[in-house]
Curated annotation (Swiss-Prot):
GO terms for molecular function: structural constituent of ribosome. The keyword Lipoprotein does not apply. Signal peptide: none annotated. One of its GO terms (cellular component) is cytosolic small ribosomal subunit. It holds the Pfam family Ribosomal_S2. InterPro entries: Ribosomal_uS2, Ribosomal_uS2_bac/mit/plastid, Ribosomal_uS2_CS, Ribosomal_uS2_flav_dom_sf. It comes from Rhizobium meliloti (strain 1021) (Ensifer meliloti). Keywords: Ribonucleoprotein, Ribosomal protein. GO terms for biological process: translation. The gene is rpsB. This is Small ribosomal subunit protein uS2. Residues 232-255 are annotated as: Disordered. Belongs to the universal ribosomal protein uS2 family.
Amino acid sequence: MALPDFTMRQLLEAGVHFGHQTHRWNPKMKPYIFGDRNNVHIIDLAQTVPMLSRALQVVSDTVASGGRVLFVGTKRQASEIIADAAKRSAQYYVNARWLGGMMTNWKTISNSIQRLRKLDEILASEASGFTKKERLNLEREREKLNRALGGIRDMGGTPDLMFIIDTNKESIAIDEAKRLGIPVVAVIDSNCDPDQIDYAIPGNDDASRAIALYCDLIARAAIDGIARQQGASGRDLGASEEVPVEPALEEASEA
């Protein structure tokens, strides 16, 4: 395997170059702005290309060394895409509301994850002896916990890298990552603060096609890292019970 390829044309077709209206910009983004068109900032894709390539390398290297990547995107148009990409690449995700202390208070989060596992056991048991109302309340509790924590229930600890869509919306997640020294890969739109991000990707963070492109590339970089890790350990990937789905095969099955 190798790092996923992408082209300037793909970025253009996905609308990665469209920033926000000029009056909404963050002046710190000036180095990444190509110009403006109809009062909308145009992001300099000549900078996005190498910065995205660098981010993909960081993701692959993190996973290849046994690290965990947490995908974060809770806005409506990112939620499902974030979850799908993380699952496809055997990583972790938060796609509902970010709970304060999710990283900095991991012990409390771990207790909630244990409660979620316990509810799974209870509700899977036929001989639980609960009334219909009690069972319904337990199912609601499980659904609420699963929505918040389902994507990190098997993470086993804080991640080694975070990938974030919309740094303004996910500012609490970024603050927690900074406090714990967790590096952050993130898309920075024209209204964002690039100083907070270790591996910034200048680009639109609102268009669903752009979000889908970033997430697909990051997922494929993680899969590349898995292959490198297994190759380095001498493990026979073809003999594994579960193997990552190659993007080319996935596309062929959908065609």
